[in-house]
Amino acid sequence: MFEKPVVKSFQYGNHTVTLETGVMARQATAAVMATMDDTSVFVSVVAKKEAVAGQDFFPLTVNYQERTYAAGKIPGGFFKREGRPSEGETLTARLIDRPIRPLFPSAFKNEVQVIATVVSINPDVNPDMITMIATSAALAISGAPFNGPIGAARVGHIDGELVLNPSNTELENSKLDLVVSGTEGAVLMVESEADNLSEEEMLSAVVYGHDQQQVVIKAINEFAAEVATPSWNWEAPAVNTELKAQVAELAETRLSDAYQITEKMARYEQVGAIKNDTVEALIAQDENLDEREIRGMLGSLEKNVVRSRIIAGNPRIDGREKDMVRALDVRTGVLPRTHGSSLFTRGETQALVTATLGTQRDAQIIDSLMGEKKDNFLLHYNFPPYCVGETGFVGSPKRREIGHGKLAKRGIQAVMPSVDEFPYTVRVVSEITESNGSSSMASVCGTSLALMDAGVPIKASVAGIAMGLVKEGDDFVVLSDILGDEDHLGDMDFKVAGTNAGITALQMDIKIEGITKEIMQIALNQAQGARKHILSVMDEAISGAREDISEFAPRIHTMKISSDKIKDVIGKGGAVIRALCEETGTTIEIEDDGTIKIAATEGAAAKEAIRRIEEITAEVEVGRIYQGKVARLADFGAFVTILPGKDGLVHISQIADKRVEKVSDYLTEGQEVPVKVLEIDRQGRVRLSMKEAVETPAEGEAPAAE
């Protein structure tokens, strides 16, 4: 029934990788089962042989899905099946998409869908690297016009050494978590989080990762040669050179003039008018011309106009030199009732950022295939349509918003205090209110400011900058603080976040081959200068965390009790702690070691909760006088509550100096009486005396029981 499957195994660092095709999903264009030390991913590729008529974009879709059966689990929730992609799945899908997208020919508009399914998981081997490798292999054997294959590597920095594909355990002690992907000759994508590493250390890690993944690229080439899928007979549509010349004659000079308009919306309006005029003029001459073809040529012309001006050394679109940062405006405390806020503006890019402090129960619980963990620092990025002057759908976050939020979080993570240093859950929200390039890096700057405004003791200010590149032949120009147009029309998007001490996050997307180590070094050094300039402006507004948190934020008070007293504070079925929270208006969290965290917006409420917990956990002291409350009467005496949950017996002979016939003649239930602790027997029973408490009034009384 099956043809003999093609299997390729190779050693990749400390891991054994196996690629297999020919058994499953034989109706797909290509399919690969890839395994790295018991972590297995099944990747299918379906590519349409024909493009949809008139389609002017490349419809590539990457879906990444983790199945809970891979970890031997059943999904939670009512329906007991996987639902929409998690944030982690979305980020991995973007990680796969970014290096493969530029390797399809620019004229290729056929629909391509990649579906990656994690089917087995080794908790020590993250599935993202093997998924990227499997995707590369599947595309390499698909026959579609793909200029790969690519490799992928994760690089750690542990004890001063670079480590290839570190395990999750090793990553906990690493100063770097960097993913690099590229072809045999070029780096295409970098995604990283670092703990204040230098530019040289980051570049070394990128080069190391690219060198190591050559093993993968070689193995995939051998795998593809063995599968021997015939290549498609696809050719880029012929360019109508006569029409191209007409378009250039009508629009080139006007577009060059339009790109000297520095204000974005005015420039867009003028460029739009030029394109409409050109289309109308050409169709008036020949009604058979295709408007989409003309607009495609105008887009290419527009790109060439902007790029040639930059390569020639002319001022940029908004009049700046190549290494200039746009004008900055930095404000903090802009919203009266939030715990922390900032408004960061860089040219026509602006972010309104808020910081909110919560308790440990506000932490996000992430239940992934790799296990459950708590996240005490959340950063959410919103990109509403009005920020670019458009209308559009407003709803749940899109892939891009999730990705940008994660990048900003990576930039800030290294300076965040530990939970022991600052026992709060912190949520940051960045609302992009204006956008013209590098809104994710504006979010980094705004987050740093908002956290300081909220009184979060971050280790240092963090700023982010987006760099760009235009390369023609051997000539290239590196641009600082790129605009949206420069990002779209350039060859590289290179985002760097960091402190004055070093880099905390680096993201790189390269659209062309030929980006050398030297070019990346120049870009990193130029980014360092821009970052330090932004940090100096930010430090003028706020250079350190405020001494106190907002009056509207919960204050967390920490106390410690003996672990064997935890059950007393919680009570039967949680009754005691529930009553404490409701009656004092506080939030109380108890850890297994007896640490209690009390969160309250008012100091008096926290003090009352602390007092009551101290009472509950207090030990009864022999010889001490307590103000007790009669709990119940018996023929032989009375049971008196001296501390919450702790009763003692006043024997009938210890009620008064004279003979007592009936206990009820002297006491009633609910009556408050002073009692002295005479002894505590081996069984923990407490013997009390009323008459000795009256006889020795000089001794200090304990707080009344409730």
Swiss-Prot record:
One GO MF term: magnesium ion binding
Biological process according to GO: mRNA catabolic process; RNA processing
Localization (cell): Cytoplasm
Organism domain of life: Bacteria
GO cellular component terms, A-Z: cytosol
InterPro entries: ExoRNase_PH_dom1, ExoRNase_PH_dom2, ExoRNase_PH_dom2_sf, KH_dom, KH_dom_type_1, KH_dom_type_1_sf, NA-bd_OB-fold, PNPase
Catalysed conversion reaction: RNA(n+1) + phosphate = RNA(n) + a ribonucleoside 5'-diphosphate
Pfam families, A to Z: KH_1, PNPase, RNase_PH, RNase_PH_C, S1
Residue span, KH domain: 554-613
Principal subcellular localisation of the protein: cytoplasm
Keyword Nucleotidyltransferase listed: yes
Domain S1 motif: 623-691
Sorted UniProt keywords: Cytoplasm, Magnesium, Metal-binding, Nucleotidyltransferase, RNA-binding, Transferase
EC number: 2.7.7.8
PANTHER family in the record: POLYRIBONUCLEOTIDE NUCLEOTIDYLTRANSFERASE (PTHR11252), POLYRIBONUCLEOTIDE NUCLEOTIDYLTRANSFERASE 1, MITOCHONDRIAL (PTHR11252:SF0)
Entry similarity comment: Belongs to the polyribonucleotide nucleotidyltransferase family.
Function: Involved in mRNA degradation. Catalyzes the phosphorolysis of single-stranded polyribonucleotides processively in the 3'- to 5'-direction.
Self-association and partners: Component of the RNA degradosome, which is a multiprotein complex involved in RNA processing and mRNA degradation.
Record's protein name: Polyribonucleotide nucleotidyltransferase
Organism: Vibrio atlanticus (strain LGP32)
